[in-house]
Amino acid sequence: MKELTCFKAYDIRGQLGSELDNEIAYRIGRSYGQFLKSENDADKTVVVGGDVRLTSEALKQALANGLMDAGINVIDIGVTGTEEIYFATFYLGVDGGIEVTASHNPMDYNGMKLVREGSKPISGDTGLREIQALAEKNEFMDVEVKGNYKKVSLLPEYVDHLISYITPAKIKPMKLVINSGNGAAGHVIDELEKRFIELSIPLEIIKVHHEEDGNFPNGIPNPLLPECRADTANAVKEHKADMGIAFDGDFDRCFLFDENGDFIEGYYIVGLLAEAFLQKEQGAKIIHDPRLSWNTIDVVTKSGGVPVMSKTGHAFIKERMRKEDAIYGGEMSAHHYFRDFGYCDSGMIPWLLITELLSLAPDISLSKLISAKRFLFPCSGEINFKVKQAKLIMEQVYLHYYENSIHFSAIDGISLEFEGWRFNLRDSNTEPLLRLNVESKQNIALMNDKVEELTKLIKKLDI
């Protein structure tokens, strides 16, 4: 029985040929179908979609064949971003959904993201290990009645849902640069543009790298990397736009640029979105991760909301949101989660909400909004250290700082707070890395000093 190394902690990702091919995709379909059928033998339906990668369509069809051979009905919604699968799964009330995507991974990779009913995530401890075991064993139960297959477009319904997050009459005239990175976002932007015209929403869109093209002629879209930001930034400056928006390949993350073309750290976007929601629903709960938190806590508290800290990672955030009935959850990594979107992440909802937030304060630019937050709570951004013994170093760092700290949390790694500054240090689930985030209160020099101090200590301990 050969191990399938494409199964990761939270999803499926692998190099084409050696780790993932059509035959393995078929087995994953059979396995997921058998996994669903093991709960009860009622009719089951799964939604499938795929991004623009050149191999996604063939993998999706193999996956669909596996599902149907397991007795599962398949609804194929075509070329999609991951969030379109999330939407289709909860909107149609079906039993699960699978998106074929490798997001921002290299060209020779592909993968899958799986959810079950209500778009609840399937990851290591919620079914993915069982599906992996079935796929590796490759011995499937006989099925008397195969599932059926149909193609459906839900784009109009999905765009209706996106528009529901804003009040069209409140939107002021604005010029937006949108860089789809030749990924799956293009068709959604086109449909949104039509809807803006129909509803007299005065948003002008300048499109960059718009055509969906699995060859990715302008490089793999991953705006988290500084080298992937120039085209968006330059277009914002050239067209004198009010905001720039850039997506990764399956557009589950969006990255924002102010009117000067400057990239905005995801941390500060969490605060903006929290404020936008608390203007709509006073007293709501907002979930945030512990890596950087002071700005979010400050905004939420001042806006009359309740900040709730959760461990980093989509499965943890979604679970905590459901438990708390939180309206919104945000991570500094540009993942934003919404209660009314099945507690799932969306890359489209954030920028729509921020256009409304800017419209409600028409004399304040995006750069002014963000610079005020950067001044109050300057942050380092995430700094990665490749180390030999991550957990041992974390323990030593904790012992070094704990005595002088005023607050400690182990929700995710170690978070220690002091007068005027704090840090979070956590190890990666998948790589031999330590990830450091430092922030301060109105003191950039202190923040930089502490980054240097912690960097020296971590390197000294890595022996």
From Swiss-Prot:
Pathway: Nucleotide-sugar biosynthesis; GDP-alpha-D-mannose biosynthesis; alpha-D-mannose 1-phosphate from D-fructose 6-phosphate: step 2/2; Bacterial outer membrane biogenesis; LPS O-antigen biosynthesis. One of its GO terms (biological process) is O antigen biosynthetic process. Its cofactor is Mg(2+). It is found in: Cell membrane. It holds the Pfam family PGM_PMM_IV. Binds 1 Mg(2+) ion per subunit. Its EC number is 5.4.2.8. Mg(2+) binds at residues 103, 248, 250, 252. Gene3D superfamilies: Alpha-D-Glucose-1,6-Bisphosphate, subunit A, domain 3, Alpha-D-phosphohexomutase, C-terminal domain. One of its GO terms (molecular function) is magnesium ion binding. The keyword Magnesium applies. Coiled coil: none annotated. The active site is at 103 (phosphoserine intermediate). Keywords: Cell membrane, Isomerase, Lipopolysaccharide biosynthesis, Magnesium, Membrane, Metal-binding, Phosphoprotein. CDD domains: PMM_PGM. One of its GO terms (cellular component) is plasma membrane. It catalyses: alpha-D-mannose 1-phosphate = D-mannose 6-phosphate. The keyword Nuclease does not apply. Belongs to the phosphohexose mutase family. Involved in GDP-mannose biosynthesis which serves as the activated sugar nucleotide precursor for mannose residues in cell surface polysaccharides. This is Phosphomannomutase. It comes from Vibrio cholerae serotype O1 (strain ATCC 39315 / El Tor Inaba N16961). The lineage of its organism: Bacteria, Pseudomonadati, Pseudomonadota, Gammaproteobacteria, Vibrionales.
